[in-house]
Amino acid sequence: MYLINAIYFKGDWTQQFDRARTAPAPFQLADGSTAQVPMMQSGDPIRVRAHRDAGLEVAELPYGGRAFAMTIVMPRNPAALDTLLAGLTAEQWDGWVAQLDTISIQVSLPKFSLVNDLSLVAPLKALGMDIAFDCDPPEMADFTRMHRPQEACITNVKHKTYVDVNEEGTEAAAVTSVEIGLTSMPPTIVIDRPFLFAIRERLSGTILFLGAIRNPAGR
């Protein structure tokens, strides 16, 4: 038996990228090499919110009526993303968002797709849910209101995420299954180094999807 929790998001950019302008461009990798990736170009300046400081650039591209947005955080140093992720806090994130200013600017952003599949057993056990995974009576959790007979336990929890970003916008979905048994900005912002992205609801700040792109080409 599976218990399934799913979330789905499909958003069109408020100002879409011109598909005819998408072309291969170099993307700097953490090891100092580069990869050719399909880079989307806005062509005319588009209205985004952005912030830049000595170590990173932050840009927020809105969807539709601007209730949702993709926030991108790109370290200047291509090798610095893992360090940024290791030290990331909610307060730091809120500080970046608070400094965003609305500006009209040309944007270059790589097309990318992200598929991730992982087991959540270890993280859930670390949060104190060990008993749910104990399959030896009499230590088993009581799942009789969900499953008969009583002798049932969770054997695995898998989480799969899919995100596709293109000229029109973003399509994203996540499913969890449980098995029982930018200061003053330059005229252009180019996302051409490893970056962190979040799809979030702007009013509440709720993050729906969070990911890191190290190589959009996936090689």
Residues of each region from the PLM?
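Secretory/exported precursors with cleavable N-terminal leaders
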Residues: 1-219
